[in-house]
Amino acid sequence: MTTAVPAITSVSAAPAPGARLKMHREGPVLVLTLSNPTARNAINPSVYRAAAKAMRATSGFRTVRAIVLCGEGEHFSGGGDLRRLARQRKLPASEQHGHIGALHEWIMAIQEAPQPVIAAVEGAAMGGGFSLSLACDLIVAAEDAKFAMSYVNVGLSPDGGGTDSLVRALPPQAALEMLLDGTACTAGRLYELGVVNKVVPHGEACATALAWAQQLARGPFEVQARIKQLVYSARGRSRREQLEAERESFLASLYGDESGERIKEFLSPRKKQETSEEGPAT
């Protein structure tokens, strides 16, 4: 069932001519759609700010249990608006500094959201569009989708966390190949590398991502948030520090309401019967 987004519809505005962020609810799932189809859903600072605001607002709604990010029409996002950047060169660097900061606030809002965030990629995910998809927790891509760190092709270094995301996911050599070469990479190749989670037929990325989000939305909200936090903070910790973080998270989960309800359900006679009928797990 499609419903309006409660209490946060004000951030779904038309930020600038040709570039919009659309939002709607599908039950417990919030769907954010990049809408600028005539320009392959190019994004700009107004979209960055609207999206970051939406993400931060959504973090406070436990009724929103998962988030899907997609593009309108045939593409996910071609990245930043090069015409705007060409004009920006005539203005002080301090102004562009603020614009990039807005993009990076959006990236951090995705990472810090308690809900799982799934990118649904059709067509092109280029430059900032690729960085944006990588910032999401999970990626569903159409089999003919193309991804490229195309910044280098126009004499730019990446933003939007692209370097960080690739180095977290890949060996340095593979990351540098994408960053220095700038050519398109297929969804299948990224799936083989472990960057893309699911590859689906053309036109089915959003529907598949939404179905996955609906499944995740049935999971334990607070535990999923803790898992995200553990994963994203692991690289900056020693093994001992991560083990301590896991212990604290486990204890918080064990004594929380979510585990109490789910453990009780799992140990119920009915659940035992279902498990017995399914056979041993090993």
Model-predicted regions and their roles:
Residues M1-L30, G182-G188, C206-A207, A211-T282:
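C-terminal alpha-helix plus adjacent terminal tail
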Residues L32, L69, D81, L132-L134, ...:
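Hydrophobic/aromatic residues within transmembrane alpha-helices
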Residues V47-A51, H99-A102, L132, E246:
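Hydrophobic alpha-helical membrane-association signature
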Residues M108-E222, G256:
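Crotonase-fold acyl-CoA enzyme core
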